Amino acid sequence: MSMDYNIKAEDGVINKGNLYRLKKCMKKALNGGPVITAFLGGSITQGSLASDSEKCYAYLVYKWWKKKFPAADVSFINAGVGGTTSQYGVARVEDHVLRYRPDFVLTEFAVNDKNDEFFKK
């Protein structure tokens, strides 16, 4: 079975946004405040193929925050669930991520969202 992963930029959602909230979060960390990092996604976020749980990308990003901002009280939420799509992520984001009021959130559903009309919308 061959899968086509050629995605044109005009078919996707590209939002460069602004860096205001990220800068605010980093300033909070620089000042030694509490920073909650949260990660929502599928098995890549969960770390299912990592050699151990501390080698998954989410934990490595969390460790980066702790290293760059040693005065901050950085906490870690990994809401990665293998085999799930962004549609399921939307259904669980409130309970698994937002209720903790995170300062920094990364979302990844790269593998499980299919290249079909539903996920292109």
Give each language-model segment a name.
Residues L40-G41, I77:
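A secondary-structure boundary/capping signal
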Residues F39-L40, E108:
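Structural cue for short, hydrophobic secondary-structure segments
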Residues S48-S53, D116-K120:
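Short, solvent-exposed loop/turn segments at secondary-structure boundaries
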Residues M1-F39, T45-D52, Y62-A72, A91, ...:
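N-terminal secretory targeting modules
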Residues K55-Y59:
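Short, surface-exposed alpha-helical segments at coil->helix boundaries
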Residues G42-S43, V81:
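Active-site metal-binding loops of divalent metal-dependent hydrolases
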Residues P70-G80:
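Short helix-loop-beta-strand segments that form the rim/entrance of peptidase-like active sites
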Residues D4-K16, N78-G89, Y100-F119:
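Cell-envelope and extracellular/periplasmic
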